[in-house]
A protein has these predicted regions:
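General structural signal for secondary-structure boundaries
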Residues: 1-3, 42, 215, 222
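Short amphipathic alpha-helical segments, especially helix-boundary/capping motifs
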Residues: 8-10, 35-39, 59, 97-101, ...
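Alpha/beta catalytic cores of nucleotide-metabolism and tRNA/nucleoside-modifying enzymes
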Residues: 22, 68, 89-93, 112-135, ...
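Active-site-adjacent beta->alpha loops and helix N-cap segments on the catalytic face
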Residues: 1-12, 26-32, 48-73, 78-89, ...
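Active-site beta->alpha loop and helix N-cap motifs at the rims of alpha/beta catalytic domains
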Residues: 16-45, 49-50
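Catalytic cores of alpha/beta
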Residues: 28-39, 73, 78-97, 140-154
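Hydrophobic faces of well-ordered beta-strands that scaffold small-molecule active sites
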Residues: 17-23, 44-46, 73-76, 95-97, ...
Length: 263
């Protein structure tokens, strides 16, 4: 608890205007949430793999009662409209939508459960519950961000796109053929679980490496340019106009091949 609060303090010292931090739904989650609030954290993410759960209901209710309305509570992950409706009723302000779509996640393979992220966004947005929706998983490029926003997401979460940058965790190493790379691992991988809790169970992530990308600023600039261009193709100046103007179609595998560079 103290170590996480210290990380929040350090983020503010580095000039962060807003800091969010994650808690679970068991053990000392409420103590942790209170500690984070005292450190100035105004965004608490209640983060579990299967968010539509009775333990989530208990945690959201307790955190809301303890911290009041001054804290923004993010919760997830979920994949259905039913889950979106329930989590908002339990006290969530924003929802992380997507199960098993991450580049280093193998939940769908190991458990047989999960829904394509874009479908989940459509379904949760269609419930019209008024909560902020965050597309989480499967975002590979700026085009995927545009699609998620057009489907109803207010934000996206990205991991692999930022992995390999100077600002991401891990050391740069050089491969036998002289290329620079950085380690990238899922929090549900065996290696990550052993590091943070000393043991592992239900391995639903992998460890890999990605190409070294330099400063995160360059990555964000390219994403920003792609998103702006994407809005222009739908004649949109705002996200609301994008959702109104964009049209979705069913695409074949041949169409997907044509959509990528194929020289």
């Amino acid at each position: 608890v103290e170590e996480q609060a210290k990380l929040v303090d350090e983020a503010f010292e580095f000039g962060a205007l807003e800091v969010g931090a994650a808690v679970g739904v068991t053990n000392n989650y409420l103590e942790r949430a209170r500690s984070l609030q005292r450190s100035g954290c105004r965004i608490i993410c209640v983060d579990i793999a299967h968010g539509h759960h009775k333990l989530m209901e208990r945690a959201l209710s307790n955190i809301r009662s303890a911290l009041g309305d001054g804290v923004h509570i993010m919760a997830g992950n979920i994949a259905t409209g039913y889950a979106a409706h329930d989590l908002v009723a339990w006290g969530a302000d924003s929802l992380r939508v997507g199960i098993g779509g991450g580049s280093i996640c193998k939940t769908r393979i190991e458990t047989g459960h999960g829904v394509p992220t874009l479908h989940s966004i459509f379904e949760c947005y269609g419930t019209d519950i008024g909560a902020t929706l965050i597309a989480d998983g499967g975002i590979k490029n700026s085009g995927d961000i545009v699609k998620a926003l057009a489907a109803g997401a207010d934000f996206v979460m990205i991991g692999s796109l930022l992995a390999g940058t100077d600002e991401s965790p891990g050391d740069v190493f050089i491969t036998d053929d002289g290329r620079k790379r950085k380690l990238y691992r899922g929090m549900a991988s065996k290696e990550a679980q052993k590091d943070w809790r000393g043991s592992y169970s239900s391995i639903e992530g992998i460890t890999s490496s990605v190409e070294y990308k330099g400063s995160v600023e360059n990555v964000l600039l390219e994403l920003d340019q792609g998103i702006r261009s994407g809005l222009s193709y739908s004649g949109a100046r705002t996200l609301a106009e994008l959702r109104e103007n964009a049209a979705f179609i069913i695409q074949t595998s041949a169409g997907a091949v044509e959509s990528s560079t194929h020289i």
